Amino acid sequence: MMVGYPLFLKLEGKQCLVFGGGKVATRKIEALLKRGAQVTCVSRDFCQPLKNLAKTVGATRRVAPTLQLKQMKDNRIVLNGAQLVIAATSDRKFNARAAQVCRRKKVLINVVDDPEMCDFYVPAVVERGPLQIAISTSGTSPLFAKRLREEMEKIIPPSTGKLLKKLGKIRGYSK
C-alpha cells in the first residue's frame, strides 16, 4: 500500500455526497458540515440522530453548510456533481460499485473500513482553534490513530487555540 499525501481540503461550499444513513455516516456528515460543505446523504433508511441533524443544519457563514437527505429508491449510483464522496454503507458490493463510478468520473471517494478502495483517508484530528493536527495510519489501524489523538488532546491544552489567534494578529502587524 502506498502512503498518502497529507493535505487539508477547503470544503466550504463544495458538493459532497455520502452514501449510508447510520451512525458512521452521521459522524462523517457532521465533520463535512463543520467545514461548510454542501452535503447530500443518500440511503434507504436514516438513523434518528441523522434525521435530527438534518433539521438543525444552517450555520451563519459566507456559504452556509447544507444537508439534504434523499431516499435511495434503487441501487443506481448518481453523483449529481459531487466533488467528494464517502461510502458508509454496510453493503460492500454497493460500496465497490460506488468506488468504480467515482473513479470513472474522476471524483475522490472514501469507502469506510475498506482502505484498498479509498482514494483518501479521513484522519483522526486534534483541533485547538486554528491548530489542526491530522493523524493517519493510512487505513491500517484507525483505532491506533484515535487513541493517539486522545493522548495528544490531553497534552495540547485547549488554550492553544487562543494563543494561536493572538500570534496570528501579531503576524498581521509584522507584515
Region spans (language model):
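A short, aliphatic-rich alpha-helical micro-motif
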Residues: 11, 78-80
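Short basic, glycine-rich beta-strand/loop surfaces that mediate nucleic-acid
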Residues: 82-89, 120-139
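Hydrophobic, well-ordered beta-alpha structural blocks that scaffold small-molecule cofactor pockets
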Residues: 1-45, 50-53
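Hydrophobic beta-strand scaffold residues
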Residues: 39, 69, 106-109
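Intrinsic disorder/low-complexity segments
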Residues: 54-76
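An accessory alpha-helical subdomain
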Residues: 139-175
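Residue-level detector of alpha-helix initiation sites
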Residues: 22-24, 93, 139
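ADP-ribose/adenylate-binding Rossmann-like module
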Residues: 84-89, 95-121
